Amino acid sequence: MRELCGEAVEAARTAGASYADARAVLRRQQTVATKNGRVDALSDIESEGIGVRVLVDGAWGFACDRRLTADGAHDAAARAAAFARASGGGGTRELAPVEPRRATYETSVEIDPFSVPIAEKIDFCLRAEEGLRRAEVKVAEAFVRALREQKVLVTSDGAELEQELVECGGGIDATAVGDGLAQIRSYPSAHGGSSAQAGWEYVLSLGLEREAPRVAEQAAALLQAPECAPGVMDVVIDAEQMQLQVHESVGHPTELDRVLGSEAAYAGTSFLKPVDVGSLRYGSPLMNITADPTTPRGLGTFGFDDEGIPAEPQPIVREGVLVGWIGSREAGFPGSMRADGWSRMPLVRMTNLHLDPGEGSLEELIEGVDDGLYLETNKSWSIDDKRLNFQFGTQVAWEIRDGKLGKLVRDATYTGITPQFWGSLDAVAGLDAWRLQGLTNCGKGQPGQSAHVSHGAAPARFRGVQVGVHA
């Protein structure tokens, strides 16, 4: 594939491109899901192709071809150059410099997930799902997934890079129904479980079968729990919900293409402006956010992004102040360009975006609350197209009274304005409570692309938060 990409780059240069890159990608994705004792979904999909991106007279062009042949490479290069020329740039476009290099990168895997037979995966899901079954649980689900992506990137700057990334993950859901209510509990995370850049050993480490009875019990208990009452109070938010909070209210608004107004699909633009970096107060001094594509097991981990930039940690917020962007070579903040396979051009995407750990334990955070809520596991989210005004719902919550957990509460929500909310942060638990979760459904772009990203966070405490809004 390296020679094929090289041919595509040369063909693009011959067609008038001042810059060109070519990515050849082989991808295999497998999903197994069971529901109420039966196989609910089973897929094993393979795809391959080449994508060519070019600059001609300051305008971008992109084309792809499913043929991993010389004809496919040359045709994609010619079409990409023609598309760029038709865009009528009429100028130049500067890209941040990158050192030419030849290198390889691959995920560390103990058990190849594609070596595990389908029948074994089905049995694994059925056994995990069996622990969810009780009278109140009307829908019991378990699922596992795996992905392998092999890709080669060659650029006219002299980069020749090969990577093999492997992902694996899974989860369980229990939906309890009764008295006109339906309540869901998930593990280890909502909306598709959790995945990591690892092998089948990661799925085994999740303990789905072990956790299933607890998940089902909580789903059933929620049917008898009172609804979260409205009010303003202190909240302690668990690591999993904090990860989505980071994703929606920090990750998307700090994507530099949104800030510059060149991207608005799916998640809107941003309340931030280019001049805000280095001065804008994003949150309290306890807020530290880092983008780190070197995180072990992170779904956003790589050796090089899809522009050939080597992976390295990048500070985004330090002591509550905005200090960096998620960006690209063109925008002057390189290192975060990724494409969803061979048929899409790279976009500015989150890698692994973390809330850095603080000090202390979850129990100590709760002890510091006289009257409040402990919120756990995302259920719903809504945020405006500037990433300012948001509301999140969690699957489960507990009242906090005099520093101790009290009764269970259902349908809990909390609402805020991004900078004010982060400004109310007054504690983040330490490294022992810090958890990494991977999600596979971050949508962006037109045509649409889905990015796989991970977020790390520990439980955090916020003062004076509006809760219990149901609208």
Language-model region placement:
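Active-site bordering "gate/hinge" segments
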Residues: M1-E312, R318-V321, K404, T440-G445, ...
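Dual-mode signal for accessory low-complexity, basic/Gly-rich regions
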Residues: P253, A264-A471
